[in-house]
Structure formats: structure tokens, C-alpha cells
Amino acid sequence: MTKTNSLHAKFGLARKLLPTLVAAAAFGGTAIQAHAADAVVLYTADGLENLYKDVLPAFEKKEGVKVNIVTAGSGEVVNRATIEKDQPKADVLVTLPPFIQQADQSGLLQAYQSANYKNVPAIAKAPNGAWATFVNNYFSFAINPEVTKTQPKTFADLLHPDFTGKVAYSNPATAGDGMAVIILTSSLMGEDKAFDYLKKLENSAKFHTKGTGYLDVLLSRNEIAVANGDLQMDLDDAANGGLSLKPVFLAAAPGGQPTTFQLPYAIGLIKNGPNQAEGKKLIDYLMSTEVQAKVPDIFGIPGRTDVPLAGKNGEAVKQAIAGVKLIPVDWNQVMAKKADWTARWKNDVIGSSGKQLDVVKPK
């Protein structure tokens, strides 16, 4: 999931970050320097821009510090934090599974038992406080309803000649929503059949993106017909970003129940970050009832069980997920298989096709 300010401005999206925020879509020599002495730095998977825009000014005013944000794909933000491990540049990390577990296992996160984690279910946080669910969400696919009149209902539907060269999904190595494609197909079909399916799906695939957020723009521009995504981001882009999008959930077989799983944004404190005191305060604030009550405004589900999924947008989330079967995911098993799955995807699915794997927004 990767969005930037210039992309938003170009395509009229509502997710325009405050002047105090910093967004970077590419990490490397051209990346924006995020840290300043009077700042707290947040590395975040994209999709939550409107929430940050709404809630961070109050934090900045109260604490007298700026919140500088670096936004990229969920795998990318962890990769950057890993590169910087010996000299951390960020204080707080927000990303998706399995990358939050990867960050924890790699020693990037510092245990911090925020008082506001107490209403997060035990299954939705690390026992030692290394991370906790910040915004709950669901994996989904998306179409442009103005163009794709016959909505795909099963995974097999995406293999139809009508979709040749019109499907795109994000790279599992760099995007949590991309890894989610492997997780869901493996859960429904079994691992070997899932990779056989994904190899067949390459006939329909136009390319793969480095993150997932840019796919919403490509869908709305009719450059592709179907893409992967997540419910919160897709609903928010449609309602607040002016994009023509409709989230869809696919079934394993004709007549079957559409199926998905929870794919939450999780938050954690980066070990030895330059401004840990303010990093802890930022986590406390983002997990407060005040902020969590605004999560439904961006079509997210509060991470805290004591904050209801309420309001008009909360009802839209409930309607979107109605009738969809939710399956559990063993994230420890995903972490154990992640490296093998990524290698198998590159070798067996992509192979020597020469297909692009890291498409990003045009410069």
C-alpha cells in the first residue's frame, strides 16, 4: 500500500497530509529525512492518512512536537527500520501482519505495555507489549464498478479470458495485502494448489505493485479491472478519495461463501528510537478512546473492544462484511512459511516471465 502527497494532489484524493507530516513512497538516497530534534517519527503502512490528518494536530498542539510520517507498503516500512536498526530514525511503527511479527522477531520493537492496550483482546496483541492492534480491518479485492459490470465471485472467475492482462496484485515480499493473497488462497485451496492457481493467474496479471494503495488509483483510471486491497482502504478511497471502487470478497468455488480474514494495522514502539518518550505518548494517544472512536470515520474497526464500530461509516463496514465468512490465521505459521512462500512466488509463479514486480506511482 503506497500513497504519496504528490499522487494525492494529482488525482484529487482527499488524503492530503498536513504540512507537518512527511510522506515518502521510496526508501533510499532520495527518501525524505523524517527526523528532527523536536519531532516524533512514525513509520506507517499507508491507508490511514485521513485518520492521521484528523487526530494528530491535537497531539502536536498538546505535546509541542511535530509528528513526521514516512508512509509506504507494510513490508517496506519494516525493511527500512531493519536497515536502520543500529541507528534508528523512527520512534513508532504501524504495519500489517506478518510484518509486525517480523519486526518483533527481528528485535526492532521494544516492549511497551501501554495502559490503553488493556482493552485490546489478548489474541490481537503481543504478550510482552511489543505491538497491539491499532485499527482492525479485513483483506479484500476491489473492482471499478463503472467498468467491471460482471463482478467476479470466485477465484476461478479471475482466470476468465475477460480478465486477461487486467488483474494486478501487490508483491507479497513488500506488501501485507500481497502476502494476504498467498495466505487466503493457501487456506482455501491448500498450499500446492494455491501456487498452481497463482501461476495460472499470471495470465490475467498485468503486473505487480510494490505496495497496494496505488492499485486503487489504477482501478479508478481503468488501467486494471481487479486488484487486491483491504476493506478499510478501499471504502475510504471510494468515499473520501473520489475513486471509483467497490470492495469484493471471493469464494473458493461456485456457490460457496465469500471468505476473508482479519488483516489489522498494528502499532509498536521502535527500540532505541530517537524520541522514545514522545513515541510512547503517541502510542498512548492513538490507542486512546478519543482516537479509537474516530477509527470508524475512515471505515476502520477500533482495535479496542470498549469502543464500538458506530456511525454511518461503521454501518457501511458492517454491511460490506455481512455474509462473508471469516477464517482464523495462525500468524506464527505464516511467519514460519513467509520466506519460503516469497521465494516460491518469485520462482514458481513469476519465474522468467519478466513481469514487473515493483510498480510504483509515476515520478
Name these PLM-found stretches.
Residues 270-329:
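Mature extracytoplasmic/periplasmic domains
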Residues 140-147, 183, 262-275, 294:
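A bilobed periplasmic-binding-protein/Venus flytrap-type ligand-binding module shared by bacterial periplasmic
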Residues 54-68:
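Short alpha-helix C-terminal cap/hinge motif
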Residues 30-36:
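Sec/Tat signal peptide C-region and signal peptidase I cleavage site
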Residues 45-53, 72-76, 89-223, 258:
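Extracytoplasmic ligand-binding site segments that recognize negatively charged/polar headgroups
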Residues 98-104, 220, 225-246, 300:
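A ligand-binding cleft/hinge motif common to bilobed small-molecule-binding domains
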